[in-house]
Amino acid sequence: MPSASVKLTPNPKNIYIAPFDTSTAKWMVGRDGIELVNFKEDFQTNFTHQLQTRLEKLAPTEMRWVNDLPDHGWLVTGEFTTVDQGSRALRTAVGLGFGETTLQTTVYVYDLDVSKTQYILSFRTGVPDPKHDTGAGSGSFPAGLSALGEPISTATGLGSGLKLDTTRTCREIVAILAQYM
């Protein structure tokens, strides 16, 4: 558990990303065996690439593995906790939050100037706020609204799926880290 007195060094020269752990997540994606293994690998790769692209807006960003870390910068890693592909058929036919997808992560941020073994910041993404959650739609946004408050079509299933949840999760991570720049 990080100490409340230890803070992230602002404006790191570099941000590093280690692949998020896929081993402990609850995977509800309609696959098993080698198909599930391949899905997890592809999902992790796509997620990491999108996160790297978005973190580049804050500082130069590159992939690193935990056993090959420099002495300065931030390391962003974490674990997928829930990956639920939902039901495209229900999203398309019924809408209104039925068949929703879910992507939840726990993110750990290490300040390599302070420690390579103890994270400084931890937060969860994709977890609805019970005070504001309507119980409908992916993530914590009301059914029929995107993360930007723009209307989405529930009739065609647009604005749904793990691809959108991945984009939303990466944006959420970057928005939180931007507060520490």
Task: Show the residue positions of the predicted features.
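A structural "domain/chain start" motif
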Residues: 1-53, 124, 137-181
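Short beta-strand->alpha-helix linker/helix-N-cap micro-motif
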Residues: 58-70
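Surface-exposed short loop/turn segments
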Residues: 67-135
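A short, hydrophobic secondary-structure junction motif
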Residues: 42-57, 103-115
